[in-house]
Amino acid sequence: MDLLKRSGFDFEKHKTKGIPHQLFAEYLTTSGMCINPNIHWITFHGGVDFGYMLKTLLAHELPNEESGFFDDMNIYFCNYYDIKEIKRDIDYLTGGLSKIAKELDVERIGTMH
């Protein structure tokens, strides 16, 4: 919670102006961003974020087994890449998101957290 607050997340604004998670799931699934092989999801250490999105989309608990989680990932988020995982196999990519973005000449968007 502190991390989110330090990053600028406004819990009170979210409480008063946010949308229910069921509606978010409906918007996300009907947006064309899920179950679409033309969309590519790129994250940095995004497993927990995908976990929350899957739990919201599925409207029940996540699978107990990792294989079940990845089965669901492959359905809803057909193409996903986690730069933190990819960098393990690339010697010259070291450090956190900001450093890697700079090395790849990619503009970082969002606050560091």
Question: Where on the chain are the PLM-derived regions?
Answer:
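Metal-dependent phosphoesterase core characteristic of DEDDh/y 3'-5' exonuclease domains
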Residues: 1-113
